[in-house]
Amino acid sequence: MAEPVDTPAGTITADHFRPGHVRHQVAVGPKFLYALFNPQDQLHAVSRAFMTFVRDGDLPYRRLIVDDHIVDEAATRLKKQASMRNAASFLATLDESTLYQFESVSEDVFDGAKATFVEWTDLDASLTDFTVAAHMESLEVDHILTYDRHY
């Protein structure tokens, strides 16, 4: 069992991330990825702690799901707000890792996300957020790693 990790947000243990029922896949949101690949981000240590717990087998996740919209937003944000080096490291990790699973968003899923985006005006969510949620539903993925509150 991994040791607790001290972060600016407090002490983090594997139990902070443990789902209510065991699933082996989880979607990974762009803000989580941005924090993970940007050592200057205030939530970097929290994202790293999660990955440590996954790597050490303390959490059940074996597939970290990303899609075209997640990758685009995370890479662009890393390039513009951190550095091209951080963005390139992120993209190389996706190519080399067996943990990350790339799943393309189908046209039907994207069309549904666009319709919901236009209809639900009371949420402060981006089109990417709606696309990720619709894609998760289509893949039957119950959990997402994100720092957004509107999921």
What are these regions (language model features)?
Residues 1-66, 79-89:
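Short, well-structured N-terminal submotif of metal-dependent ribonuclease cores
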Residues 34, 75-76, 114:
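Amphipathic alpha-helical segments within well-ordered protein domains
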Residues 28, 65-66, 104, 127, ...:
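Short beta-strand scaffold positions
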Residues 75-104:
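Helix-adjacent hinge/juxtasegments
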Residues 98-120:
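Acidic catalytic patch
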Residues 60-63, 99-101, 140-142:
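Short active-site oxyanion
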Residues 126-143:
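Acidic, metal-associated active-site segment
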